[in-house]
Amino acid sequence: HLNPLFIYGRSGLGKTHLLRAIQNYINSNMPNLQVVYKDSNELLEDYMDASAAHDTEKSSYKNFKMYYEEADVLLVDDVQQLQGKKQTLDIMFQIFNKLTSQGKQVVLSADRAPKNIDIDERYKTRFNSGGTFDIQPPEIETKLSIVKSFIREYEDMEQSGPINMPEDVQICIAESSGSNIRELKSAVTNVIVKMKCGEGSDITVADVRKLLENHFSGGPSKRLTADDILKVTEDFFKVSHTDIVGKKRTRNIAHA
């Protein structure tokens, strides 16, 4: 039984999106279940607020615990941010253990494996006690599926009819992107906005390449063409294009 389910991977690979997708799926398909999603910083703030109010309002701390313990599914994002927060970790694990002992599901995410989080060994062991999954950078097929998913998500959010983005444009977005899912999502949004601003379904691959030219921080390496190589060679050896491609061979050109 994958409980807890621990998902990790470097920033930008879509962990938050995945946790939100779990939340949305359960809310849509199992509305009788109570789902709680919290970023670790939000959980920390909830705990600090409850602790600070505890002296004047005895129920505050109890209400804090009840809120989390009444969840059927608890999703906690970026748990590595709880490093050094011993009291918060302690209370989180009390909640954690109570939920799992009742057969309720806990899903956690982090930007590194449990063994690399600077917390007490017993917490690491507990993180590893269910299922631990490493999210890898997506392949092109996966990125294309993500592009299509973001388009559907945008359609549902805007409710302004279907977005007829050409297939070759979708492929171009996927191929141009790196591994950062947030950047991929914003690229899809940028293309949709451009389409809505007058381009419509006539938007081309050339339009998209120009639009996203400097969008991706970790995009694929630029493909070098023969002209690219010639240009670098000409600049380095201080020779002309004609000298390189012509039949004349001086000493400098021969070295080039």
Task: Please provide the spans of the model-predicted regions.
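Conserved AAA+ ATPase "SRH/arginine-finger" region at the nucleotide-binding site
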Residues: D118, G130-K143
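Walker A/P-loop nucleotide-binding motif
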Residues: L2-R20
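Terminal-proximal interaction/regulatory segments of ATP-powered molecular machines
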Residues: D243-A256
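Short regulatory helix/loop adjacent to the ATP-binding pocket of P-loop NTPases
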Residues: S51-A52, P114-S129
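Short glycine-rich substrate-engagement loop in P-loop NTPases that contacts/grips substrate
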Residues: N32-V73, K86
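Conserved AAA+ ATPase "sensor/coupling" helix adjacent to the nucleotide-binding pocket
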Residues: G130, L144-E158, K194
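Conserved catalytic/switch belt of AAA+ P-loop NTPases
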Residues: G84, L89-S109, E121-R126
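C-terminal helical "lid" of AAA+/P-loop NTPase domains
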Residues: D168-E175, R182-C197
